[in-house]
Amino acid sequence: MAPRPPSFKTVVVEVDRDAGVGTLRLNRPRKSNAIDPDMWLEIPRALAWLDEDEDVRAVLLCAAGKNFCAGIDVSSPELLSEQLGQATRSGAPSCAGREAEAMYRHVRRLQESFTAVERCRVPVVCAIQGACFGGGVDLAAACDVRVCSKDAVFCVKEIDLAIVADIGTLQRLPKLIGHGRALEMALTARAVDADEAFRVGLATSVLESPSELQRNAFALAKTLAAKSPLAAQGTKAACLHARDHSVNEGLEYVANLNASRLRSADLAEATRARFERRAPAFAKL
């Protein structure tokens, strides 16, 4: 019997085993899916569970309600303080050095929550509707493919809270849309609509409505899930490596990768299926 997805407070996990698609849905719609302390913990846990499920060959990351993600939850001064790692630790010795070390470790933990998207072996498709602000941009930028509805609005909002965006936007967004555009978005906190997001490469397609977005994004994830899981995993890994390394280093990496991939059963199956004019049937990863 297939394992049942775990239950979480702030996200929902579902698996369509026939399609090979796992869905991770942000589920705080009344708060516009603002990121609270529970969500920071649950997103990587949900992704880790999906990554270990052999039936899941692609992940759809989406959100309940009208908005994808409003960024960190700033609904109260106390919650904002906790989110920023400023809560006091009773009984712990304190000095500027220790406080800086604690803040460093706090930020690194938050970064790891969204880097988990990149570390997920399978492709992750992100479906964005409504507001995608602050931490929402951090999360979307970590995904492999982004599609949005016409009402989507992107905003790197941190500077308006006197914060340097530190969860991944300043590292990933320039690689997606270029250094100049990313820096302008981060310095101005200017809202970018869906059409502009498509023009600059932040989104690969724009759908008319949120319902059409969900159908299209799931269909895209299903298409990716039908590919060779070894080839899909390798393609994702090679592209991520190439992003952060030189061309020569990237070529060396993919040569080593394909030294094993070109001897896989998936290559033989894809070749047979092509000559037999049928869809290939790949084994689980």
Locate predicted features.
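Terminal low-complexity tails and localization/encapsulation signals of metabolic enzymes
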Residues: 2-11, 272-285
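Conserved CoA-thioester-binding segment of acyl-CoA-metabolizing enzymes
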Residues: 1-64, 79-80
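Acidic, divalent-metal-coordinating active-site segment for phosphoryl/phosphodiester hydrolysis
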Residues: 189-196
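CoA-thioester-processing core
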Residues: 112-121, 127, 133-187, 200, ...
